[in-house]
A protein has these predicted regions:
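NAD(P)H-binding glycine-rich loop region in Rossmannoid oxidoreductase-like domains
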Residues: 82-126, 134, 154
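Conserved Rossmann-fold NAD(P)-dependent oxidoreductase catalytic core, especially the SDR/UDP-sugar
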Residues: 126, 130-177
């Protein structure tokens, strides 16, 4: 996978794949295998679809709205890209999407810092289980689930945090808890016998803090607050944090899918493997777009109390 350049350079260096125009020469010949990718409207879904196409797969995306991917593809590659619109809460739409599929990469999820538990349960848990059940009915032997380190990380600052078993009981927030339940369901289905005589092979990837061109989550939120002067550094920003550049995340999806047998029944945390201080991370993002980097610091105990108060307020909102 790509070894990331310094953060400030990463946005201006034209070499990253995600910043280059999509060209026909990037794509391997078709390998005649069709992969269903759920949730292709976001940054990870879009780049994963392109990475799978580059690797020679036919890719069928499944989400509620147009992914916009077809417009990026050369005319000769476009026949290998398919799109089915539908929701994970609609079993009939799932059945339609799985026809003729050889494997599944499940990235779709309800992602938000707040919301009613039932909404997370319906999409992230019940939707995943419905997709799993349909995969067994259609005798589809490959199922790669895109999870999150938050399913096994309760907030402790530890090297390797997030690489333990998914724990719904200790996960923080509805998103993490629902993803933890779903991941456990995916891994428990590993080895399920299929009508073809094969067995279902499942694994989970836990990408950590994905960022890159097109990001509307991590980077966009940091920059929005930095422009308004509202980004404090916790204890001076000295804490270490690892992230995952989008090119590496998309490569991990392809490698994980192609190595499902080796990863069967397991979850894998994916990062750049280059921990940086929070101050360096934020400074790099801000410098790259000409925004002043955060300078004021908040003591950790104050931030913890404020965070707990915010969590309680969110819980009271409709």
């Amino acid at each position: 996978m790509t070894n990331p350049a310094p953060l400030a350079a990463r946005y201006t260096d034209p070499s990253p794949r995600s910043l280059r125009p999509v060209e026909e020469s990037d794509f391997a010949p078709s390998n005649a295998e069709r992969v269903l990718l759920t949730g292709a409207s976001g940054m990870l879904g879009r780049e994963s679809a392109l990475a799978l196409l580059r690797a020679g797969y036919t890719v069928r995306v499944f989400q509620r709205s147009d992914s916009g991917i077809a417009a990026l593809l050369p005319d000769t590659i476009r026949p290998r890209f398919e799109q089915v619109r539908g929701s994970l809460t609609n079993r009939q739409a799932i059945e339609q999407a799985l026809t003729g599929v050889n494997g599944i990469v499940h990235a779709a999820a309800k992602v938000s810092v707040s919301g009613d538990w039932r909404d997370y349960e319906r999409v992230n848990i019940e939707g995943t289980k419905s997709l799993l059940d349909a995969a067994v009915e259609h005798a589809i032997p490959k199922f790669l689930y895109i999870s999150s380190p938050s399913v096994a990380h309760a907030g402790a600052a530890l090297v390797g945090a997030g690489n333990g078993d998914a724990s719904p009981e200790h996960a923080r927030g509805n998103y993490a808890r629902s993803k933890a339940v779903a991941e456990k369901a995916v891994l428990q289905m590993n080895g399920t016998a299929l009508s073809t005589g094969e067995h279902l092979c499942t694994s989970a990837l836990r990408p950590h803090l994905i960022w890159g061109p097109g990001d509307t989550q991590l980077v966009e939120r940091i920059l929005e607050r930095a422009r308004a002067g509202r980004v404090p550094l916790l204890s001076g920003g000295t804490g270490l944090i690892d992230t995952l550049y989008i090119d590496n995340a998309a490569d991990a999806v392809v490698h994980g899918y192609e190595r499902l047998k080796a990863l069967a029944g397991r979850a894998v945390v994916v990062t750049n493997g280059q921990p940086r201080t929070v101050a360096e991370l934020m400074s790099g993002f801000c410098t790259a777009v000409g925004v002043p980097a955060p300078r004021f610091s908040v003591p950790a105990p104050v931030a913890v109390v404020a965070g707990r108060l915010i969590e309680k307020v969110w819980a009271l909102l409709p």
